[in-house]
């Protein structure tokens, strides 16, 4: 009996080991067969027990006979799968197939290949790119007066617009042969981060021509004639671009786009040509009020078949329309939350343009949606994440300094535990954002077009940016609330919802896009199964489906085993690519990767097309994927920066908070999974020991707060590219100066309290009075008194807020300008 039990344990262990190692069906069958033969000859146990084992084993032998397997099993599953497969529109298919699969694909495997991520080169600026950031970018930041822009003008000054155009800020993605800067994605991102730390309005103005728009589309799809004519003009700022997709009825839903273009004959520049008569209504279009070249998405029809062929509905098409084309109405402005970057509606009635206005010419008619989704991912990885990161870096930079200089109860407010917790949270989230931005743009420079990470970055960086803005307001209080020239938080806080809403609203991105696109695009077998199901050649389709199906089954079993073993052992036997203080985070990501992949497969198998409608389940699985992706970016960023030990509290807080979120979202997914018996099985495999992963410990809060509230390499790395130059209008530079003065003054203040206040020699309640009395009592020297007065003056300059004559605040008032004029 004992021997039989030992053999059962050995057999079970071998099965688990083969599943964990992802042995092929043939290899697993062979190994188990050899063991069974040995057991049958030499093992103990009754004959019926051995017969049972062979009865369980022989079907696996038959599964290796592919024609038989296809006939008996795959054929039936194939028919069921085709019925379950949800209908997919052309726009959905093009969106799913857009871009490339990168690290996101590894996280779907249940056993990510860390070498793929860790071997990638750390992104670096070239000498030319660094010179641009230190030169023109620095100068642009110095020119910016955000209060003047947002309150007085509701626009950028002409000299700022001219500088942006002349220095090539709108030409960062345009190759040098067309007169552009041809910057890397990483450099492009760093430029935006720096500008965003100074002004969200100016950053929004800079990013649009470098994101999805005429220049990007021309580079990839334009004809040579279009490129040679338009790209140099765009690079020099002679043409100002905008792109119109969003409309009042359907938002950005291209499948329901009501804007139309009808192919017909018409007069263009004095000649009768075949062209397109456009009717459209767009809104929320950045740069539209001043744009000279309007990129336009519309549905193209050819009822008279003037383009040749039998097709009358060509689908979504993109064309470039000059501003002054008859029928175009443009110039009015929207006013997005006191962030007065140029944004407004574009309308067109019976606008006639030649067929050559189509990007890429007539041969690319109907390819507009493919163009947009293929190029959207790059812009979504750069523009909004960089703006959010720049704003967050500025908020952390100022909040750390402000919390050091603002005192309550004779101590800096940043020393209170509650404030420490908020500052630590802000800093860790900023570290996550910067890591994701840096590593992902590096991947783009390596040739990737990561469509799923684009959604992850867009959603999570803007959401973290919103949280950081709220936290900065909480810590700085009235300083952030009272608007005026001295307020460096208010306008950025007001503009936060803009980034939440644009380029795919965050609710939509979380509930539909991240997991919905990733489950098909990144899964190693789902897309292959879908393609097989839609293959008109039935024999080939069944053969491909059979191969994908059985790989998928083995994949699911392996991930179930990996998830169970990882959970039981607390990830301790999971292989990690690194030793040292970050090793455990790699192990936990591997464990959650297996759990996520297993849960994904069970959900898709049991719910089928219904999963598409269960948006909350999809959102939670997307959160798990996002948490693993962002934690991976944190670890890679830490490696890229040389593994500085002083940054470990930030890394620990970031990874722990992300992996805790992954655990909690998996838990929430299981609680709400509609097939309850399957949920119970999944819970037993994913959480056999319960919820064992903890959120960041409170002990990290003071360590991180100290890093942020003191000058040092960790603070400098975290807030790299923040515009901090010490000049009268840059309050981030001024608050940094005040912080340094406060730190230098602390020993002197302490001496006054100990030797003066406590002994009764100093009785004044305010610092200026205490300085006078302490100097008179000989507690401090004259030089120390001068030092303290300078420190107090600088601190009060920061702490003080603006007040106004009531007439200055009346809408449209010129009172302030009259005062300035004398």
Identify the meaning behind each predicted range.
Residues 347-380, 397-414, 559-583, 592-612:
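A glycine-rich, basic-preceded beta-loop-alpha segment at the flavin cofactor/substrate interface
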Residues 271-329:
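A short core secondary-structure module
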Residues 343, 351-352, 358-371, 475-493:
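Flexible glycine/proline-rich, aromatic-decorated loop/lid segments
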Residues 7-16, 28-38, 48, 52-209, ...:
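Amphipathic, small/basic residue-rich leader segments at the start of a protein or domain
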Residues 418-445, 470-473, 626-637:
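Loop-to-helix element that buttresses phosphate recognition and phosphoryl-transfer chemistry
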Residues 448-480, 649-662:
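Charged, glycine-rich active-site and insertion segments that engage polyanionic ligands
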Residues 326-352:
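Flexible, small-/acidic-enriched active-site or ligand-binding loops
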Residues 551-822:
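C-terminal amphipathic alpha-helical interaction region
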């Amino acid at each position: 009996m004992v021997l039989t039990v030992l053999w059962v344990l050995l057999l079970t262990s071998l099965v688990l080991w083969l599943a964990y190692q992802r042995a092929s069906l043939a290899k697993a069958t062979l190994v188990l067969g050899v063991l069974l033969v040995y057991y049958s000859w030499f093992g103990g146990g009754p004959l019926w027990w051995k017969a049972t084992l062979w009865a369980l084993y022989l079907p696996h032998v038959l599964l290796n006979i592919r024609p038989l397997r296809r006939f008996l099993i795959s054929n039936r599953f194939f028919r069921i799968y085709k019925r379950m497969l949800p209908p997919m529109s052309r726009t959905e298919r093009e969106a799913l197939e857009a871009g490339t699969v990168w690290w996101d694909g590894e996280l779907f495997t249940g056993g990510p290949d860390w070498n793929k991520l860790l071997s990638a080169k750390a992104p670096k600026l070239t000498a030319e790119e660094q010179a641009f950031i230190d030169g023109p970018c620095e100068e642009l930041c110095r020119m910016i007066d955000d209060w003047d822009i947002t309150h007085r003008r509701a626009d950028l000054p002409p000299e700022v617009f001219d500088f942006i155009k002349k220095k090539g800020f709108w030409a960062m993605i345009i190759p040098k042969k067309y007169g552009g800067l041809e910057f890397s994605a990483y450099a492009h991102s760093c430029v935006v981060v720096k500008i965003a730390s100074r002004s969200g309005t100016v950053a929004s103005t800079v990013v649009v021509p470098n994101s999805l728009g005429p220049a990007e589309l021309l580079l990839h799809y334009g004809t040579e004639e279009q490129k040679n004519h338009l790209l140099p003009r765009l690079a020099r700022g002679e043409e100002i671009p905008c792109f119109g997709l969003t409309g009042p009825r359907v938002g950005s839903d291209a499948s329901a786009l009501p804007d139309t273009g009808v192919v017909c004959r018409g007069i263009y520049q004095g000649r009768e040509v075949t062209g397109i008569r456009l009717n459209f209504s767009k809104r929320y279009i950045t740069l539209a009020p001043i744009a000279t070249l309007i990129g336009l998405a519309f549905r193209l029809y050819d009822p008279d078949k003037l383009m040749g062929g039998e097709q009358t509905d060509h689908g979504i098409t993109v064309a470039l329309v000059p501003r002054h084309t008859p029928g175009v109405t443009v110039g009015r402005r929207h006013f997005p939350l006191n962030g007065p970057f140029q944004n407004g509606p574009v309308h067109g009635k019976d606008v006639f343009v030649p067929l050559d206005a189509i990007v890429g010419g007539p041969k690319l008619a109907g390819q507009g949606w493919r163009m947009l989704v293929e190029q959207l991912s790059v812009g979504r990885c750069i523009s909004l994440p960089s703006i959010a990161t720049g704003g967050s870096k500025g908020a952390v930079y100022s909040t750390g300094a402000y919390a050091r200089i603002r005192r309550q109860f004779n101590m800096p407010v940043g020393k209170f535990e509650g404030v420490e917790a908020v500052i630590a949270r802000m800093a860790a989230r900023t570290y996550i954002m910067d890591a994701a931005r840096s590593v992902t743009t590096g991947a783009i420079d390596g040739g990737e077009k990561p469509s799923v990470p684009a959604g992850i970055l867009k959603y999570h960086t803007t959401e973290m940016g919103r949280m950081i803005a709220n936290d900065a307001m909480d810590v700085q209080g009235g300083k952030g609330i009272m608007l005026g020239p001295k307020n460096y938080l208010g306008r950025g806080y007001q503009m936060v919802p803009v980034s939440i809403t644009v380029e795919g609203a965050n609710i939509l991105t979380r509930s539909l896009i991240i997991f919905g696109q990733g489950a098909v695009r990144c899964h190693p077998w789902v897309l292959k199964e879908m393609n097989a199901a839609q293959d008109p050649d039935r024999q080939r389709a069944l053969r491909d489906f059979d191969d994908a199906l059985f790989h998928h089954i083995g994949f699911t079993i392996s991930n179930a085993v990996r998830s169970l073993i990882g959970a039981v052992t607390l990830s301790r036997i999971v292989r990690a690519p690194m030793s040292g203080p970050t090793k455990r985070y790699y192990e936990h990501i591997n464990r959650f990767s297996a759990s996520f992949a297993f849960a994904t497969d069970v959900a898709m198998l049991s719910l089928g097309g219904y999963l598409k409608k269960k948006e909350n389940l999809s959102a939670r699985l997307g959160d798990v994927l996002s948490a693993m992706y962002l934690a991976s970016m944190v670890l890679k960023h830490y490696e890229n920066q040389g593994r500085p030990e002083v940054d470990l509290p930030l890394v620990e807080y970031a990874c722990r908070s992300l992996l805790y979120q992954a655990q909690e979202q998996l838990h929430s997914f299981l609680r709400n999974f509609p097939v309850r018996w399957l949920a119970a099985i999944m819970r037993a495999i994913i959480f056999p020991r319960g919820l064992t992963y903890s959120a960041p410990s409170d002990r990290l809060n003071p360590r991180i707060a100290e890093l942020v509230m003191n000058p040092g390499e960790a603070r400098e790395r975290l807030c790299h590219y923040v515009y901090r130059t010490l000049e009268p209008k840059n309050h981030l530079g001024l608050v940094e100066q005040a912080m340094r003065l406060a730190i230098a003054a602390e020993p002197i203040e302490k001496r006054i309290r100990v030797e003066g206040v406590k002994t009764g020699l100093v009785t004044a309640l305010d610092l200026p009075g205490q300085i006078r009395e302490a100097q008179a009592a000989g507690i401090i020297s004259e030089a120390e008194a001068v030092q303290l007065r300078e420190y107090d003056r600088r601190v009060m300059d920061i702490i003080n807020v603006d007040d106004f004559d009531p007439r200055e605040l009346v809408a449209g008032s010129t009172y302030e300008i009259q005062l300035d004029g004398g």
